[in-house]
C-alpha cells in the first residue's frame, strides 16, 4: 500500500521438510504475504531512464464472467490498452495508437504474477508434498479461508498464490470465495485512511527520522541524486519526490528488471536510503504501544482468534478450515513483525510471506488422559462452595482455557526463516524460542487490541 518497495523475495533452493520437533503436530496454517512486483505508483525519475510506460502487463488480458443461461464460468479474453488525454482538460483521449500490455500505476507486472504463483508452488511443495499437512486435491472450498485488501494487486496476488498451491487440475469445479472488506473496516494493513491518529503518529515519526538521517543524506546521496531532482538535495520528508517515493520507483524497476541509470543501483546509496525510510515508516513501532495498537493490533487479534477458534473446534470435534491465505502489503508484514519485536528493520521484498503455524504437542495427550480422573476430583473439591458459584465459574473457565492452550504452540516464519518473537525469548518449546506457547502469543496480542478503535483513532489537537 505504501510508496516504498524493495527487491524481490528469494525462495530457498530446497524446500524444507519437517523442521520442528517430532512431538509437535502441525494443525493450522495462516499465510500472510505481500503482493508481487508492480509498476511504480507514480511517474518518477524519467531523467534517470525509468520509462513512463512499462510494457510489462501482457498477462492482464482476461477475466472470469458468467454468461446468462450458462452454468459454468467462462474466461473472456480481451486486448487492453492504456489511453492518455491530449490536453489538460482530461476530456479528449488520444487515438488508438498505444501499445498493448502497458501497466497502469501500481499494477502487478508479469514478473509479479510469476513470483506470486511461485509462492503458491512453494507452499504446495512444503505443506502438501513434504509435510503432507494439506491434501493433494482440494475438494471442499470451505477448507480454506482467503482474504485480500481491496487493492487489485493484492487480490490478483492472492489468486496467483492460490493457483500455485492448488492448480485447476487439483481442485474441484466452481469458484473459491475470497473475502474483502470496505476500506472503513479494513485491518489487513495499517489503515491510515480510517485512522487520523495513526496518520499523526506516522507524521511524528517521519519528522524524527528526518532529523536523524537528513544529515547522512546530505552528503554522497544528494550528490548522486540531485542531477535527477532538478539540483535539489535528497531529504527523508521535505524533498520532492520524498525519499520513500524515490526508493519505491527504483526498487520497482529493479524488481521487474527495468533498465535505468546505473548510478542509482549503488549499494551504499540504496542501503542508506532504505535505513532512513524504514525508520520513517516503522521506527514508531519500536517505542509506541499506540502505534502497535492502531497499526497492527486489530489484525493480530484476528489471527490469534482464528487459532484459538481452531483449538476449540478441534477439542469439540467441530469442522474448521485448516488454511488461511491473506493477500496484503509490505506495511502489513513489517507492522506484524515490528509489533511482535521480531522485525529485522529491512524493507519487506515483493512477495514476502509470513507463515503462522499452529502446533499441538501430542506427546502430552496420553499423560493428560491418565490424570483426568484426578483432575476432575480436584476440581470438585476446589469449587464445591455454592456461595461462590459466580466467581468460581470464572476461575474454572480461566483454568480450562489455560489448560486447553497449554499444549499448543505458534511459530512464525518470515521468508522461510523462523523468527523469535520478543515475548517468547526464553519461553520457547524445549528451549526453541521460535516455537512460542499459544498462551503467550495470545496474551501479547490481547495487550495490543484497540478495544475502542474509533475513539483511539481520533486526532489529537496540537
UniProtKB/Swiss-Prot annotation:
Gene Ontology cellular-component annotations: mitochondrion
Can you list the disulfide-bonded cysteine pairs?
none
Could you confirm whether the keyword Hydrolase appears in this record? Answer: yes
Q: Which domain of life is it from?
A: Eukaryota
Active site positions: 35, 330
Reaction catalysed by this chain?
a phosphate monoester + H2O = an alcohol + phosphate
Quick one: where is this thing mainly located? mitochondrion
Sample GO molecular function, one term: phosphatase activity
Q: What class of enzyme is it?
A: hydrolase
Tell me the Gene Ontology biological-process terms attached to this UniProt entry.
phospholipid metabolic process
Family per UniProt?
A: Belongs to the histidine acid phosphatase family.
The name of this protein is Probable acid phosphatase SPBC4.06
Amino acid at each position: 500500500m505504501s510508496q516504498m518497495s524493495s527487491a524481490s523475495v528469494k525462495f530457498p533452493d530446497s524446500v524444507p521438510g519437517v523442521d520442528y520437533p517430532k512431538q509437535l503436530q502441525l494443525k493450522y496454517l495462516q499465510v500472510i504475504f505481500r503482493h508481487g512486483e508492480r509498476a511504480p505508483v507514480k511517474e518518477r525519475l524519467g531523467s534517470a531512464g525509468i520509462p513512463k510506460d512499462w510494457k510489462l502487463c501482457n498477462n492482464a488480458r482476461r477475466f472470469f464472467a458468467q454468461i446468462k443461461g450458462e452454468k459454468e464460468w467462462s474466461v473472456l479474453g480481451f486486448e487492453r490498452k492504456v489511453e492518455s488525454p491530449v490536453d489538460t482538460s482530461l476530456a479528449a483521449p488520444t487515438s488508438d495508437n498505444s501499445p498493448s500490455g502497458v501497466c497502469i500505476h501500481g499494477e502487478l507486472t508479469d514478473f509479479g504474477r510469476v513470483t506470486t504463483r511461485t509462492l503458491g508452488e512453494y507452499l504446495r511443495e512444503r505443506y502438501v508434498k513434504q509435510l503432507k499437512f494439506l491434501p493433494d486435491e482440494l475438494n471442499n472450498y470451505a477448507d480454506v479461508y482467503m482474504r485480500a485488501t481491496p487493492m487489485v494487486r493484492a487480490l490478483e496476488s492472492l489468486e496467483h498464490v492460490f493457483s500455485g498451491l492448488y492448480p485447476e487440475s487439483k481442485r474441484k469445479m466452481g469458484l473459491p470465495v475470497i473475502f474483502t472488506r470496505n476500506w472503513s473496516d479494513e485491518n489487513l494493513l495499517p489503515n491510515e485512511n480510517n485512522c487520523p491518529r495513526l496518520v499523526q503518529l506516522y507524521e511524528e515519526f517521519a519528522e524524527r527520522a528526518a532529523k536523524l538521517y537528513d544529515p547522512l543524506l546530505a552528503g554522497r546521496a544528494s550528490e548522486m541524486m540531485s542531477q535527477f531532482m532538478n539540483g535539489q538535495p535528497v531529504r527523508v520528508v521535505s524533498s520532492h519526490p520524498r525519499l520513500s517515493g524515490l526508493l519505491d520507483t527504483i526498487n520497482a524497476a529493479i524488481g521487474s528488471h527495468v533498465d535505468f541509470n546505473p548510478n542509482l543501483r549503488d549499494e551504499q546509496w540504496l542501503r542508506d536510503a532504505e535505513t532512513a525510510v524504514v525508520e520513517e515508516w516503522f521506527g514508531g513501532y519500536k517505542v509506541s504501544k499506540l502505534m502497535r495498537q492502531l497499526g497492527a493490533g486489530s489484525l493480530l487479534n484476528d489471527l490469534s482468534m482464528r487459532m484459538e477458534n481452531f483449538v476449540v473446534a478441534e477439542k469439540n470435534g467441530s469442522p474448521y478450515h485448516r488454511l488461511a491465505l491473506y493477500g496484503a502489503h509490505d506495511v502489513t508484514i513489517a507492522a506484524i513483525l515490528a509489533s511482535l519485536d521480531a522485525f529485522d528493520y529491512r524493507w519487506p521484498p515483493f512477495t514476502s510471506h509470513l507463515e503462522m503455524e499452529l502446533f499441538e504437542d501430542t506427546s502430552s495427550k496420553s499423560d493428560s488422559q491418565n490424570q483426568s480422573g484426578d483432575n476432575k476430583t480436584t476440581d470438585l473439591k476446589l469449587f464445591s462452595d455454592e456461595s461462590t458459584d459466580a466467581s468460581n465459574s470464572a476461575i474454572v473457565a480461566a483454568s480450562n482455557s489455560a489448560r486447553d492452550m497449554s499444549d499448543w504452540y505458534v511459530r512464525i516464519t518470515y521468508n522461510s526463516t523462523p523468527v523469535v518473537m520478543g515475548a517468547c525469548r526464553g519461553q520457547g518449546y524445549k528451549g526453541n524460542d521460535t516455537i512460542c506457547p499459544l498462551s503467550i502469543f495470545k496474551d501479547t496480542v490481547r495487550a495490543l487490541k484497540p478495544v475502542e478503535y474509533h475513539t483511539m483513532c481520533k486526532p489529537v489537537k496540537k
